[in-house]
Amino acid sequence: MSAKAKNKLTPQQRKVTLNRVLHKIRPYSAFVVCSLLVAAVSVAAQLYIPILCGDAIDKMLGKGNVDLAGVLRIAVSILVVAAVAALAQWLLSVCNNRITFSVSRDLRNEALRKIQTLPLSYLDSHPSGDIVSRMVADVDTFADGLLMGFTQLFSGILTIFGTLLFMLRENVPITLVVVCITPLSLVVAGFLAKRSYGYFQSQSTVRGKQTALVNEMIEGQKVVQAFGHEAESLAAFDEVNGQLQDVSLKAIFFSSLTNPATRSVNNIVYAGVGLVGALYAVRGGITIGQLSVFLSYANQYTKPFNEISGVVTELQNALACAARVFELLDAEDQVPETENAAALQPDGHVQLQDVSFRYLPDRPLIEGLSLDVQPGQRIAIVGPTGCGKTTLINLLMRFYDVNSGSIKVSGTDIRDVTRASLRGSYGMVLQDTWLRAGTVRENIAYGKPDATMDEVIAAAKAAHAHSFIRRLPEGYDTVIAEDGGNISQGQKQLLCIARVMLCLPPMLILDEATSSIDTRTEVRIQKAFARMMQGRTSFIVAHRLSTIREADVILVMKDGHIVEQGNHDQLLAQGGFYAKLYNSQFEGVQT
């Protein structure tokens, strides 16, 4: 299915989207009313200026009887009215900007709050670049297009009715010439707007894909270059870029036809007014000043039709972007907490009872998993890639909910406690390090913002990060780049370990926590971990089996099941799957 067909909104969907937009604007009704009032003042002032100009012309066309005093008074009046119109335009801009930026801020805040309530499955299945595009580019287009377009639409309608009333007062037949020809521009604009709307929707969708691809390429540039995939990456980007160019050119082609097409209609109107008005002036039906007023009004009457047609196109694009933003806001939240969810009081006792889980309905990953972890035990989880090790960690943290069975901490089902208290009970160090853009100190104190400097330094020393931090240009005040590019992967992992060392929650999750650290530092870190894990229930996911010899219990997982269980020596003695895994990692060393 094409992007255009897939994203096309029905009239009912457009109506619903527009109603939601108006709901977002409602908190700023005072600014909206002010905007409409000053727009009306601006239109009235602009409509009054042609009358003054016409009067001035008539006062200068008498037979040797030019009223200079009258012309001067009119000139002063024109200056005053023009100043009022300019002031009104400035106030209109102030009000519109306030509404636009306020609504943009509110929407982005709402979108970020939404992301924090979305299930991990949504974030795993949607490119981060597309989500960023919805929060940034689509919100900007939506706010600018709808709010500014609405004001232009209102001003245009006022101008149309205002000029129509003034023209009818002056001369009905000439007015009919204007009224009969001008609607042609609406017919043309409506046809072009329908054609361009679908392309604007496709443009927004493809732009999201492009942002996601660029984000992916930038984050993985080292891997791309290491594997020599520059050409393939460029080809993929060129394909998406070509799609964006194609839909953008089609959208711009039809929207750009609007202005010349409506201007052609305007020229016909202007010529018709000039011809009919000249005939009336020759016969004495109107004065030259009145003809001048009519020509000016004819131009002002047709101008809003040009603007309205352009605004309609802009509104179509804005509605398409608004629909994408609301699609994000309407995404299904993670399973809500129970009404009486209590704060978890963990004692370290963790039970998994007949747990089953699958990411896809037809692909079971974990089936019938049961486990009883006593307080203070160190549980190592090993197995081949894809056996469910990290998935089990996600279930313990309730990033995903089990499909069946239950997970209990301190005898309480984790679905009956608050997520914040559950996740706050674990200290987590992952293989994939994440640091925020900020100072080293801020990153270490991420889980405890009120930590003193002494506490931060103590945590860094415990994680063996203090020595390298001291060598940084600003020490603990060194700013880490957004992607952590100014420190090594191992240093990033040390900071993540220090972050957990500072908080020391009652339970720990270490997912290959020392994978990016050199062997010498790893030995020291393992000793620090050993002290930290004393008395704390700890889950250790490891690929290097040499790191989990001291675990109280080693769970060997295969195809979502625990196939072996015991300590290191027991499992080696059994000569089963664990023994094969362990020996395979040391075959190269022994040979």
What are these regions (language model features)?
Residues 1-46, 61-75, 92-96, 100, ...:
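Membrane-integrated ABC transporters
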Residues 2-11, 101, 109-133, 137-139, ...:
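Short intracellular "coupling" helices and adjacent cytoplasmic loop segments at the cytosolic face
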Residues 26, 37, 49, 70, ...:
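Hydrophobic alpha-helical transmembrane segments of ABC transporter permease domains
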Residues 77-85, 89, 182-189, 255-269, ...:
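Hydrophobic alpha-helical segments in the permease module
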